[in-house]
């Protein structure tokens, strides 16, 4: 599943491409109904066509696209979702769907966007989703962008890049494992399996430890490690360990810099031990048994 660095990379890619452009075409294939969460295709069409994109925002792993009529499009990529920006091919709108050369068979939702001034070329935004676990919502009228009535979005904790040490210390006062706290989007938004494992390794802390067992020094180390690995993930434009690509269809490269994630059986980069894998809260968890302290 795309995590904060992957989603933020996509947001930074699409923001300059679509802000100020008008939605001039919209196609939803039948399978798009699996992605649409709260409205039907007709309602989506009626509330978005001819509207202009005003900005693009990321909250946790959600992508938020407000329009100039106060409607808001919200997207979540799920496990395999992608957002791609493409040039408009020199064929009719309908013809684009007759061949994978123009529209991939896993693209179930497509928006054409036009520059009202005519200065920029028209573009297409493709929502591509192999497994159909991605989500798209439309809020037809929203007065406060900070209060979007979508349950998972409304319950998000502080963003992992912006969380303060005071907030981080507070959420770690728990008997839950550190890994499960890092993955709980209600506690801290944006961290997933990859970056939780990498942050725990960077901080030298065992992922099974209870949050409340951390000393003040360890809390600071883990807080800094979370921010550091996320920023490194952004630097390398995300981790492409499965389906993820940026908005141009290019893979990220942070997977080349992973220290523990999916490194089971390999030698630790800092010692002679082998990386271990266990199941924790239903998720595969990777760590070095020597470098990561289990505490007292």
Identify what each model region corresponds to.
Residues 5, 9, 166, 224:
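Short, contiguous clusters of charged residues that form electrostatic/catalytic patches at enzyme active sites
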Residues 73-190, 195-202, 210:
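Phosphate/anion-contacting hairpin/loop surfaces
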Residues 1-4, 101, 162, 215-223:
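Generic detection of long, well-ordered alpha-helical segments
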Residues 23-44, 57, 167-296:
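Basic, nucleic-acid-binding surfaces and adjacent catalytic neighborhoods in DNA/RNA-processing proteins
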Residues 1-134:
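Gly/Gly-Pro- and Ser/Thr-rich, intrinsically disordered tail segments characteristic of DNA damage-repair
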């Amino acid at each position: 599943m795309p995590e904060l660095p992957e989603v933020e990379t996509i947001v930074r890619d699409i923001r300059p491409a679509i802000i100020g452009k008008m939605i001039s075409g919209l196609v939803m294939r039948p399978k798009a109904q699996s992605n649409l969460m709260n409205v039907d295709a007709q309602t989506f069409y009626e509330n978005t066509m001819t509207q202009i994109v005003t900005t693009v925002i990321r909250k946790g792993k959600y992508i938020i696209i407000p329009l100039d009529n106060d409607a808001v499009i919200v997207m979540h990529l799920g496990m395999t979702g992608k957002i791609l920006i493409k040039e408009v091919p020199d064929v009719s709108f309908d013809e684009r769907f007759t061949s994978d050369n123009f529209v991939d068979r896993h693209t179930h939702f497509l928006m054409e966007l036009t520059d009202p001034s005519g200065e920029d070329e028209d573009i297409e935004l493709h929502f591509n989703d192999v497994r159909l676990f991605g989500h798209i919502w439309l809020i037809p009228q929203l007065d406060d962008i900070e209060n979007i009535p979508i349950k998972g979005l409304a319950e998000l904790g502080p963003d992992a890049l912006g969380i303060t040490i005071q907030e981080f210390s507070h959420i770690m006062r728990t008997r839950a494992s550190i890994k499960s706290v890092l993955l709980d989007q209600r506690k801290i938004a944006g961290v997933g399996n990859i970056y939780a494992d990498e942050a725990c390794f960077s901080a030298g802390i065992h992922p099974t430890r209870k949050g409340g067992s951390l000393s003040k020094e360890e809390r600071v180390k883990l807080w800094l490690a979370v921010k550091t690995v996320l920023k490194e993930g952004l630097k390398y434009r995300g981790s492409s360990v499965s389906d993820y690509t940026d908005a141009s269809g290019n893979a990220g490269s942070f997977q080349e810099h992973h220290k523990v994630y999916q490194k089971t059986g390999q030698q630790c980069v800092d010692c002679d031990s082998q990386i271990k894998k266990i199941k924790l809260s239903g998720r595969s968890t990777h760590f070095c048994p020597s470098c990561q302290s289990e505490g007292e």
